[in-house]
From Swiss-Prot:
It is an enzyme of class 2 (transferase). Keywords: ATP-binding, Cytoplasm, Glycolysis, Kinase, Nucleotide-binding, Transferase. It is found in: Cytoplasm. InterPro entries: Phosphoglycerate_kinase (IPR001576), Phosphoglycerate_kinase_CS (IPR015911), Phosphoglycerate_kinase_N (IPR015824), Phosphoglycerate_kinase_sf (IPR036043). Pathway: Carbohydrate degradation; glycolysis; pyruvate from D-glyceraldehyde 3-phosphate: step 2/5. One of its GO terms (cellular component) is cytosol. The lineage of its organism: Bacteria, Bacillati, Cyanobacteriota, Cyanophyceae, Synechococcales. ATP binds at K206, G297, E328, G358, G359, D360, S361. CDD domains: Phosphoglycerate_kinase. GO terms for biological process: gluconeogenesis; glycolytic process. This is Phosphoglycerate kinase. GO terms for molecular function: ADP binding; ATP binding; phosphoglycerate kinase activity. Substrate binds at D24, F25, N26, R40, H63, F64, G65, R66, R122, R155. Its EC number is 2.7.2.3.
Amino acid sequence: MSKLSLSSLDKTHLEGKKVLVRVDFNVPLNEDGQITDDTRIRAAIPTIEYLVNHSAKVILAAHFGRPKGQVNEKMRLTPVAARLSELLGQSVALTNSCIGDEAVAKSNSLSNRDVLLLENVRFFGEEEKNDLEFAQKLASHADMYVNDAFGAAHRAHASTQGVTNYLSPSVAGFLLEKELKYLQGAVDSPNRPLAAIVGGSKVSSKIGVLDSLLDKCDKIMIGGGMIFTFYKARGLDVGKSLVEEDKLELAKDLEAKAKAKGVELLLPTDVVLANEFSPDAESKISQIDSISGNWMGLDIGPDSIKVFQNALAECKTIIWNGPMGVFEFDKFADGTNAIATTLADLSAFSEVCTIIGGGDSVAAVEKAGLAEKMSHISTGGGASLELLEGKILPGVAALNDA
């Protein structure tokens, strides 16, 4: 799916034009209302600076939190505007509302190279309903549209899809373009062998991804809490480990599908057990056929780490989505950290394309200080999963074709 991108527009297209840019500024705040991680804001800077440098008038639209269609003072974009001003080195004005007379007056008074941030679009329930009248009001601020919010591209909302009915051209920003290049590229035309490492606690949240990846991958490694559903489906005792009883047949089907397709499906052969779910729990290493009693598995074991590392060393493209264990507890973070280090090394020394597909794996890689060493770190959680599942993202489909 080739879409028109911002890189195809130059100063002749952009100078003096009001450009509505959908960005993903849904960043975490602490109790004092301070931003604790500005990754998503920094990720939008290349697109914003390109527009500023080409003398456009930049109007940013973003959501923050889940205000449920009402104004929530704790979910205003004030701290975001302040941080963005620092990163850009220029003042960023903020409206009181994303639509209405005050917002229109501010967008109409912009000079070339100015940046304006519209207040939280989710203060209006019409945003998530993709209400076209609301979308038209948003679109009335601008002459053209750029979507750079990959993290919201799987939503058919007014600011991601509806506005494209009223603004042309509607193009992909640099972040969205990069996300599609890596994630779509890994799925559609990877350098092989292609491996996927899928972790996390529940099979249910990764069914679509696993099923889709079985059609595309040469190897799949499974870790995290979901492995115990596979073990129980095989008839093994898993002690008090997390199991989704209603997904046992599905686990059997996925193993059978892998075998039928000739995909190497690797599950851990040993695990790190704990006597309780706690950072200070008593722990021990056990083979998967020796789990019993009150013990629960919270990480993959050292033998499994080596097997996974050897399998990954043979690959040219690797997608990682989901941790290998409860990495938030240092005692049970070895599996996740080992995978992160392995991918960083393969990326640096063997020119392997390493893609970290959103969510907890990103947090794990950042916690390990290895983010800079990966080929690509996705900014989307649900959007990454849906793209890897082979789904069409509404926010992407709505853009002009290249």
